[in-house]
Curated annotation (Swiss-Prot):
It is found in: Cytoplasm; Lipid droplet; Endoplasmic reticulum. Residues 357-439 form the UBX domain. Residues 12-48 form the UBA domain. Plays an important role in endoplasmic reticulum-associated degradation (ERAD) that mediates ubiquitin-dependent degradation of misfolded endoplasmic reticulum proteins. By controlling the steady-state expression of the IGF1R receptor, indirectly regulates the insulin-like growth factor receptor signaling pathway. Involved in inhibition of lipid droplet degradation by binding to phospholipase PNPL2 and inhibiting its activity by promoting dissociation of PNPL2 from its endogenous activator, ABHD5 which inhibits the rate of triacylglycerol hydrolysis. GO terms for cellular component: endoplasmic reticulum; lipid droplet. Residues 299-361 are annotated as: Disordered. It comes from the Eukaryota. InterPro entries: FAF1_2-like_UAS, Thioredoxin-like_sf, UAS, UBA-like_sf, UBA_8, Ubiquitin-like_domsf, UBX_dom, UBX_domain-protein. The gene is FAF2. PANTHER family: FAS-ASSOCIATED FACTOR 2 (PTHR23322:SF1), FAS-ASSOCIATED PROTEIN (PTHR23322). GO terms for molecular function: protein-macromolecule adaptor activity; ubiquitin binding. This is FAS-associated factor 2. One of its GO terms (biological process) is ERAD pathway. The modification N-acetylalanine is found at residue 2.
């Protein structure tokens, strides 16, 4: 059953919670979760912020002060290797040791009292981290000025960034905390850390992060790792999905001994990295497979959607076509109906046909486009428009036509035009008592 602090958490958040607790040493799971939630589960920002919360210094992300960061150094799973300073040998050595003992005691006592009193006058500037990367670069430059440029490759980034890179790359992270005032620091850096075989091992097998405890960034990491003496080295790696301190090396260690201890720690914990690497590969393969399945599903979905879209477009095209045909049919019906009504109206408005005995009458024989003939009498005084209206009212006549005379061959102006605003009468048009006129179909023109 999950702990109360881990309820309602995703797997990724649970892993970050456990990793944050392991790196900071905070025993309360509630406090760890609260801190991570304040930083939106950004573990790098949370760890860096915890390193800033020392002795009343405000947090960058959380203004209320908090207790100093702690690391559980009593974990029996952490491999520890401590090199003690050699005891004096012989009468001369013991004599020198006894003579110097009071001076050393007095010196360190006065130094501690001075530092303690100074804390009340001026807060320790190391409590405020303003430029963590600048602290690393500054330490590297001072290291090279003092011990030369032949040294392991320094990680130029914050402690939290180094942790994240080691986790992402599944590599060991070796952390070195430099005590400037310690008597063994110079000898360790010059003879051990800068030894060619040590440089080769560190550069090829792990990331190397180092800083002086006199720098704010180094001091914060020192508060987290809680070294007992200097020189101090801590080996950190991803273990059980958490960045974990798996080895601590303290004291003046010689190059061969350092290589043996680092190799032992790596060999003892290599299986965790191999296991994590296999799990990552499996997760990546699962993710790739899921992505391929999702892509195949999306491709199939897009294909189905495209088919459905084409079907809809085809249905819409057919619907519009049918609607267009129907509209055309209705329009044609309306046109024919209007035409028929117009024919009937023209027929009703025609003047009576003159009698054959009327000397002012004209007998006209019309030859229609279908070769049929129609005969009717008109009065000389009537307009040519009457002839057009008569032909228009006939069922056999075309919808649009013109009337032509044969001798001489000409088109009769039966309808108003620019040349003939008022069509002439039959007499004015020069028609005789008997005429044959031809009806020419203009419907398709």
């Amino acid at each position: 059953m999950a702990a109360p602090e881990e309820r309602d958490l995703t797997q990724e958040q649970t892993e970050k919670l456990l990793q944050f607790q392991d790196l900071t040493g905070i025993e309360s799971m509630d406090q760890c979760r609260h801190t991570l939630e304040q930083h939106n589960w950004n573990i790098e920002a949370a760890v860096q912020d915890r390193l800033n919360e020392q002795e009343g210094v405000p947090s960058v992300f959380n203004p209320p002060p908090s207790r100093p960061l702690q690391v559980n150094t009593a974990d029996h799973r952490i491999y520890s290797y401590v090199v003690s300073r050699p005891q004096p040998r012989g009468l001369l050595g013991w004599g020198y040791y006894l003579i110097m003992l009071p001076f050393r005691f007095t010196y360190y006592t006065i130094l501690d009292i001075f530092r303690f009193a100074l804390r009340f006058i001026r807060p320790d500037p190391r409590n405020r981290v303003t430029d963590p990367v600048g602290d690393i670069v500054s330490f590297m430059h001072s290291f090279e000025e003092k011990y030369g440029r032949a040294h392991p490759v320094f990680y130029l980034g914050t402690y939290s960034q180094a942790l994240n890179d080691a986790k992402r790359e599944l590599r060991f992270l070796l952390v070195y905390l430099h005590g400037d005032d310690h008597q063994d620091s110079d000898e360790f850096c010059r003879n051990t850390l800068c030894a060619p075989e040590v440089i080769s091992l560190i550069n090829t097998r792990m990331l190397f992060w180092a800083c002086s405890t006199n720098k704010p960034e180094g001091y914060r990491v020192s508060q987290a790792l809680r070294e007992n003496t200097y020189p101090f080295l801590a080996m950190i790696m991803l273990k059980d999905r958490r960045m974990t301190v798996v080895g601590r090396l303290e004291g003046l260690i010689q190059p061969d001994d350092l290589i043996n201890q680092l190799t032992f720690i790596m060999d003892a914990n290599q299986t965790y990295l191999v296991s994590e690497r296999l799990e990552r590969e499996e997760r990546n393969q699962t993710q790739v497979l899921r992505q391929q399945q999702d892509e195949a599903y999306l491709a199939s979905l897009r294909a189905d959607q495209e088919k459905e879209r084409k079907k809809r477009e085809e249905r819409e095209r057919k619907r519009r076509k049918e609607e267009e045909v129907q509209q055309q049919k209705l329009a044609e019906e309306r046109r024919r109906r209007n035409l028929q009504e117009e024919k009937e109206r023209k027929l009703e408005c025609l003047p009576p046909e003159p009698s054959p005995d009327d000397p002012e009458s004209v007998k006209i024989i019309f030859k229609l486009p279908n070769d049929s003939r129609v005969e009717r009498r008109f009065h000389f005084s009537q307009s040519l428009t009457v002839i057009h209206d008569f032909l228009f009212s006939l069922k056999e006549s075309p919808e649009k036509f013109q009337i032509e005379a044969n001798f001489p061959r000409r088109v009769l102006p039966c309808l108003p035009s620019e040349e003939w605003p008022n069509p002439p009468t039959l007499q004015e048009a020069g028609l005789s008592h008997t005429e044959v006129l031809f009806v020419q179909d203009l419907t398709d023109e």
